[in-house]
Each structure stands twice: as C-alpha cells, then as structure tokens.
Amino acid sequence: MQIILLDKVANLGSLGDQVNVKSGYARNYLIPQGKAVSATKKNIEFFEARRAELEAKLAETLAAAEARAAKITALGSVTISSKAGDEGKLFGSIGTRDIADAVTAAGVEICKSEVRLPNGVLRTTGDHEVHFQVHSDVFAELNVIIVAE
C-alpha cells in the first residue's frame, strides 16, 4: 500500500516520503496515529499544499524537544533515596518510572517511556548515568545518584 508520511517514522522515512508498506501496518497503525495518509491523487495534492505548514510543525516539536533536553542536562544530577543493605545493594530496584518521577519533581516534565536504561534497572547505590530520548533525534544524559535511606 502506497502512503505519504506526515511525520518521521523510525526505519521507514521522514515527512513527505512516499513509501510502500503492508496494508495492515498502514490501516491499523500509521493512518490512525496520524503519521501517514494513503497516496491518492487527492491526498498528494492536499499534502503538497500543506507541506510548509507540516514542516514548520515538525521543526517546532524538534525545537521544544531540544529545549527539554537542555533543561535535563542543566539539572546535572538527581538524587533518589531507597532502602538498601550494608553492601549498597538495594532492596528492590530503581526503574524508569522512579527516575521519571524524580526528574519531574526536580522541575522537568518527563514520562517513563523517554528514560533509557541500557544496562537494565538500577540495583546498587552510587552514581549512575541515565539517558533520555525526548524525540527521535534528541537525546540527553543525566547523572542519577542513589543513596540509602
């Protein structure tokens, strides 16, 4: 099925690309999410008329994401306290939700799906580097300090 992308889609293309995808992927995911329209003559003409508007909207979201990434980086570090044993091993773990809540409490709005933990959940006290993906092209890093209660 031929579609026109209205947004950047990972492993598929960016705004304005005409791509061929399986019809189920287009009908059940891309079109309902507003990320694509089917490539009919009418839709192609309509898209070309609105292309500048859509590109401006995409640039605006990218600028907002870069501003959020700068705020995250400006925080420097976030401290989370958790119950731990004598050797610094936590009772339980610190996951994406805990980190997102701590960063949000520090003043930057983050949802848990934007937190990237490459080595899995945090299970020890100390300093840990955490990555955030606030946009498909924008990343940020933050130092999370876990202290024992």
From Swiss-Prot:
Lineage: Bacteria, Pseudomonadati, Pseudomonadota, Gammaproteobacteria, Enterobacterales
Domain of life: Bacteria
Alphabetical list of Gene3D superfamilies matching this protein: Ribosomal protein L9, C-terminal domain, Ribosomal protein L9, N-terminal domain
Biological role: Binds to the 23S rRNA.
Protein name, as recorded: Large ribosomal subunit protein bL9
Keyword field: Ribonucleoprotein, Ribosomal protein, RNA-binding, rRNA-binding
GO CC annotations on file: ribonucleoprotein complex; ribosome
Coiled coil: none
Family statement drawn from the similarity comment of this UniProt entry: Belongs to the bacterial ribosomal protein bL9 family.
One annotated GO molecular function: rRNA binding
Species: Proteus mirabilis (strain HI4320)
Gene from which this protein is expressed: rplI
Family matches, as Pfam families: Ribosomal_L9_C, Ribosomal_L9_N
GO biological process, one term: translation
